[in-house]
Curated annotation (Swiss-Prot):
Protein's UniProt name: Holo-[acyl-carrier-protein] synthase
Ranges in a coiled coil: none
GO CC terms in record: cytoplasm
InterPro entries assigned to the protein according to its UniProt record, in alphabetical order: 4-PPantetheinyl_Trfase_dom, 4-PPantetheinyl_Trfase_dom_sf, ACPS, Ppantetheine-prot_Trfase_dom
Keyword set includes Iron-sulfur: no
Family: Belongs to the P-Pant transferase superfamily. AcpS family.
GO molecular function list: holo-[acyl-carrier-protein] synthase activity; magnesium ion binding
Pfam families the record matches: ACPS
Listed SUPFAM superfamilies: 4'-phosphopantetheinyl transferase
NCBIfam families: acpS, pantethn_trn, PRK00070.3-2
Record function comment: Transfers the 4'-phosphopantetheine moiety from coenzyme A to a Ser of acyl-carrier-protein.
GO BP terms in the entry: fatty acid biosynthetic process
Length: 128
């Protein structure tokens, strides 16, 4: 079974939220995600793309907000630059329970928006 999730976020909205609530960075992103994004030309766009990816993964898994920590879903990069999803703790446990095999994600951003699409392949089937 293949499930999809998609999310889009206004980059400036996330930037304002982080400015008002600096602890948001540590609550939502892993230290590796923060380090990577802050080293980029447009840190806000990179952070927003990862935020959208985390939401898209949650939607594709069907777990919704609150079932796992934001940091339980980590967005890294493979050697060639392709984004990679790493699940930790509760997100990993939920994925196992759902029979999740592979999770792929695609990120994009322009001047104003960041978006992500996640595809989750699982062995679970509603048909039995």
């Amino acid at each position: 079974m293949l499930e999809a999730g998609i999310d889009i976020i206004e980059i400036s909205r996330l930037e304002r939220s982080i400015k008002r609530h600096p602890r948001l960075l540590a609550r939502v992103f892993t230290p590796a995600e923060v380090a990577y994004c802050l080293a980029r030309h447009r840190p806000g766009a990179s952070l927003a793309a990862r935020f959208a990816a985390k939401e898209a993964v949650m939607k594709a898994l069907g777990i919704g907000l609150g079932r796992c920590s934001w940091q339980d879903i980590e967005i890294t990069r493979e050697q060639g630059g392709r984004p990679r999803v790493i699940l930790h703790n509760r997100a990993r446990q939920l994925a196992r329970e759902l029979g999740v095999g592979e999770i792929t994600v695609s990120l994009s951003h322009c001047h104003a928006y960041a978006a992500a699409v996640a595809l989750v392949e699982s062995s679970f089937s509603e048909e039995g």
